[in-house]
UniProtKB/Swiss-Prot annotation:
The species this protein was found in: Human immunodeficiency virus type 1 group M subtype D (isolate NDK) (HIV-1)
Protein name: Virion infectivity factor
Main location: host cell
Region (Interaction with host APOBEC3F and APOBEC3G): 54-72
Pfam families: Vif
Domain commentary: The BC-like-box motif mediates the interaction with elongin BC complex. The HCCH motif (H-x(5)-C-x(18)-C-x(5)-H) mediates the interaction with CUL5.
Amino acid sequence: MENRWQVMIVWQVDRMRINTWKSLVKYHMYVSKKANRWFYRHHYDSHHPKISSEVHIPLGEARLVVTTYWGLHTGEKEWHLGQGVSIEWRKRRYSTQVDPGLADQLIHMYYFDCFAESAIRKAILGHIVSPSCEYQAGHNKVGSLQYLALAALIAPKKIKPPLPSVRKLTEDRWNKPQKTKGRRGSHTMNGH
């Protein structure tokens, strides 16, 4: 019998970003209690040698599983030192992979406060509006004009430490264009 392969999308992530993610998840599970229904599985509880950790996030009947890997083949860049993340949505026997933006939206929908529909009406009438959105990572596009007006009216609370964002975990911060200071950049680099 021939081998059967299953291909998964694994986002290459540097080790420090994975450590930050794990730390934020544990903080909000055990200290702030905002993620107290989440389940953290350590590497020694897994039967797969490449799995570093798993975070199971219940979403109603379904759940989101964020798996971190180690010991993978390195990527094109030297900082891709064999670390990666996969994000999976599971319900009973069905599972599918999701991208970080959708994962953040699902987490936002189930776990964190945001403006209610009545908040817009209350703000127009001059009433105090609360709560504002605690999990900004769950909004991946520009909101309605009413939502933007509310967001400008009520400054979001700064939560220390920030809530764990899957998109932030998987973003490619290395390949973003560098901004230079001033109009012409550094004088020594320009030869002036």
